[in-house]
């Protein structure tokens, strides 16, 4: 996977969703692409069968392309949830089919770059991982 592919996809999302500041609003981005976003707790009340499928698949987040639902575990740290949500958006942006390790790496790289692009880290004058985590809510 080329860095240029990840950067180009990130810039496309920023432009299409008019992202102008950080931290990005993850749920707003997902809604822009037509997803309904629920916590696992909300999903359990709404559709227990889908909730059980989510829990069997991932403890972090789950995307159901058939229903247009993305759910995430509200009990995880907020930064982890944000990463998981943008990871799922990465699968959408790259039209991934299946869970190959390549697809997972690509979605991870996309999520990282979207949440805290290198250039934004530079211009935010981050001097430590703690600075990055604080400014970009990771």
Residue ranges and their predicted role:
Residues 1-138:
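Active-site hotspot residues in diverse enzymes, especially metal/ion-binding acidic/histidine motifs
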């Amino acid at each position: 996977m080329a860095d240029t592919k990840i950067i180009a996809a990130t810039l496309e999302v920023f432009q299409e969703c008019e992202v102008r500041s950080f931290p990005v609003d993850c749920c707003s981005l997902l809604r822009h692409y037509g997803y309904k976003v629920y916590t696992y707790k909300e999903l359990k009340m709404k559709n227990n069968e889908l909730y059980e499928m989510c829990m069997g698949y991932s403890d972090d987040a789950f995307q159901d392309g058939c229903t247009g639902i993305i759910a995430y575990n509200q009990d995880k740290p907020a930064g982890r949830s944000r990463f998981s949500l943008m990871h799922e958006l990465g699968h959408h942006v790259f039209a991934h089919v299946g869970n190959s390790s390549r697809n997972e790496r690509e979605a991870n790289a996309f999520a990282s770059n979207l949440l805290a692009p290198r250039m934004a880290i530079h211009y935010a004058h981050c001097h430590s991982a703690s600075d990055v985590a604080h400014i970009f809510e990771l």
